[in-house]
């Protein structure tokens, strides 16, 4: 299995969410093929760009395919300030959420090799390479951590939609109520689980 990762939002926007989605590459490709055939979508799949109906269909395909996700969430109003009183940097928050989301998966992998694929678009490549190396150290010999251009990774694009869905709910966006209805069955079945970050390490 592969864990695909992407984030949405930022503390300046009220919350940041980080989705770690577990799917086989084959399942991710099949979800994309069906979604694009039905909707006619061309180009990159982004949670911030699709309609509510398209989001519901994509997440239904994800659920049917046996996809699962841990989503780490940090909300500005509930995040305790660091000891120095300074607001955390975007990168520090990103790294903490990534660690929480991936860390939530590792006890459940049962020793099965898990590859972790991270979107390479948010930060400088050198910074992200350091993040990748830290994840690789945590995985040890159980898997491989890599960076991917989201435009070329079907799984990362699905993770983007999951992260964006939870972000909308957390910040109570105008679409939050409808998105909450869309994801409620997946939260109830634990296909999507949420871990909240309230304090940076």
Regions found by a protein language model. Name each.
Residues 1-201:
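Phosphate-ester processing/binding pockets and catalytic centers
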């Amino acid at each position: 299995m592969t864990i695909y990762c992407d984030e949405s939002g930022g503390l300046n926007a009220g919350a940041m969410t980080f989705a770690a989605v577990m799917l086989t590459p084959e399942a991710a490709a099949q979800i994309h093929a069906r979604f694009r055939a039905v909707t006619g979508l061309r180009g990159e799949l982004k949670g911030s760009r699709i309609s509510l109906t398209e989001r519901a269909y994509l997440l239904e395909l994800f659920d049917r395919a046996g996809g699962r996700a841990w989503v780490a969430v940090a909300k500005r109003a509930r995040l305790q300030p660091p000891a120095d009183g300074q607001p955390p940097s975007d990168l520090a928050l990103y790294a903490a959420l990534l660690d929480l989301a991936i860390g939530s998966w590792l006890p459940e992998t049962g020793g099965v090799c898990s590859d972790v694929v991270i979107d390479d678009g948010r930060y400088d490549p050198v910074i992200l390479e350091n993040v990748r190396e830290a994840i690789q150290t945590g995985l040890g010999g159980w898997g491989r951590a890599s960076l991917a251009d989201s435009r070329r990774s079907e799984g990362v694009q699905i993770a983007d939609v999951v992260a964006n869905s939870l972000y909308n709910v957390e910040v109570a966006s105008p679409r939050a109520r409808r998105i909450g209805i869309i994801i409620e069955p997946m939260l109830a079945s634990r296909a999507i689980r949420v871990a909240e970050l309230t304090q940076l390490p």
